């Protein structure tokens, strides 16, 4: 899987928007414990009714512990924080390939919706150029990014811990790569 392909020009166009967190829906909820520059808990309401295949895969990976100790490898200020590379993104390992991998599970066909838009706190699935190549990586929006609508699958909304998302260490490398020690998802669980 290649890195999320987005124009660097578009990144600069978005400033961090203030806004309320989404209301918690029927779930399931993805609960992410974060350590590093950011410390705390992020709760994401997964939208099983919108993206059932993607939510099933995320839920399975979290239940298996695959997301535990995976870093936020790509973080672009005013845009998004990306994580979920369970193959190359484990803390303490060689992170030079972080963002290029996925899981041993099959890629998932796109589940686009016209009913939702990429806004602050929305969670989307990262993918390669093929819209049907999402696997394990996901990103959390710092600010609106409607240009992603119909291009990337929306899988959830942050319902608690947006202040933790806002504190995630920003990338300073090419295309938002985080140098030094990136923040890490120490434990990821699923709650009904």
Where are these regions (language model features)?
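Cyclophilin-like peptidyl-prolyl cis-trans isomerases
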Residues: 2-5, 18-192
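Sec-dependent N-terminal signal peptides
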Residues: 5-14
